[in-house]
Amino acid sequence: MNNISKQFGQRARTIRLKQGLSQGDVAKRMNVHRSYISSIERGIRNPSLKVIQRIAKALEVPMEKLIKD
């Protein structure tokens, strides 16, 4: 598990929860399985730039909000 991936996943999860969205909601917006979102949020998967863009779009936030400290 990569520390950067874990931090990214925690940011994505925090934003998702603040918006009142479930992992299933985000997964549906991205057309992926809920377990894929879960693995990203837990830092198990190292998302590509394209996936980060898709997550940002699904969460309706600028990509920078997901990757900046």
Name each model-derived stretch.
Residues Q10-R29:
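Short basic helix-loop element that most often maps to the first helix and adjoining turn
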Residues V32-N46:
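Recognition helix of helix-turn-helix/homeodomain-like DNA-binding domains
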Residues L17, N31, R42, Q53:
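Residue-level detection of the helix-turn-helix DNA-binding "recognition helix"
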Residues M1-Q7:
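A detector for short, charged/polar N-terminal pre-domain segments
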Residues A12, Q23, R34, L49-I52:
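Helix-turn-helix DNA-binding elements, focusing on the entry/boundary residues of the two helices
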Residues K50-K65:
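DNA major-groove recognition helix of helix-turn-helix/homeodomain DNA-binding modules
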